[in-house]
């Protein structure tokens, strides 16, 4: 009887919890290039740069990286050429990915980053 009560109590508590679910590419309205970039971001960037916060991450959040004329912290232009260069060659504590990502993958990644 006590086990039944505990089960129902736990079920009732969990029913009230909102579990954050990752949205699909379609729900985010991503095109094929942006979706490919999202997969690259998940594999190569997310360990240091969470899209929406930098909590417990080494690098800054990438949310809105292209919504401002200059990159936060460095004052460098926030454009595809400059951000692509940082992705390829790195900066300060960030390693470059020029040996692991093709130019097409960098372009896909930039397309996704524009959606953040």
Over which residues does each language-model region extend?
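Bacterial N-terminal signal peptides that target proteins for export
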Residues: 1-5
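C-terminal motif of bacterial Sec signal peptides marking the signal peptidase cleavage site
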Residues: 13-16
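Electrostatic cytochrome c docking/interface patches
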Residues: 18-40
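Inter-heme linker and motif-flanking segments adjacent to c-type heme-binding CXXCH motifs
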Residues: 20-23, 54-55, 115-116
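C-terminal capping alpha-helices of c-type cytochrome domains
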Residues: 33, 85-87, 92-93, 97-116
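Gly/Gly-Pro-rich "capping" loops immediately C-terminal to redox-active cysteine motifs
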Residues: 34-38, 50-85
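The canonical Cys-X-X-Cys-His
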Residues: 37-51, 109-113
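Cys/His/Pro-rich metal-binding microdomains
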Residues: 46, 63, 95
């Amino acid at each position: 009887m006590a086990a039944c009560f505990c089960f129902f109590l736990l079920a009732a508590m969990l029913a009230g919890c909102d579990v954050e679910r990752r949205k699909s590419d379609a729900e985010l309205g991503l095109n094929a290039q942006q979706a490919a970039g999202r997969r690259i971001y998940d594999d190569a960037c997310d360990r240091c740069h969470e899209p929406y916060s930098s909590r417990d991450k080494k690098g800054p959040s990438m949310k809105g990286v292209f919504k401002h004329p200059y990159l936060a912290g460095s004052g460098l232009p926030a454009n595809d050429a400059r951000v692509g260069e940082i992705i390829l060659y790195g900066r300060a504590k960030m390693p470059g990915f020029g040996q692991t990502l093709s130019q097409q993958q960098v372009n896909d990644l930039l397309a996704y980053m524009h959606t953040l």
